[in-house]
Amino acid sequence: MPDDSLHHYLSQQGAQFGGVAGEQVAQNYGDTNAEHRALTESVALVDLSFRGCLAVLGDDRVKFINGQVTNEVAGLKSGQGCYAALVNAKAKMQADLHVYRLDDELILDFEPGLLEAVTE
């Protein structure tokens, strides 16, 4: 990994790493109370690069995704998001995810290891 990577930066800040879905991610910095204060009273950087992410493009993206999930995506404005379950044709849950609406795309954000279930 290059010295300017996020991993290197977080290491310099005292991050203790662990494995998530085959990736090394910061799990803590050794002081839970200080971490909580930083998150609630200041600003914090949280590395979510290990999560699955999929961009949905095309003119029918909103209609298509709206028919695949349990929440109302069509009502979202650009910059808004919602939590939803992705279901199959028999309404069986395939994954839980967040859907974010941007001007020209929808972003699906889901737990690691679920890409196959989401793209099925």
Predicted regions and their residues:
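Basic, glycine/lysine-rich polyanion-binding surfaces/domains
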Residues: M1-E120
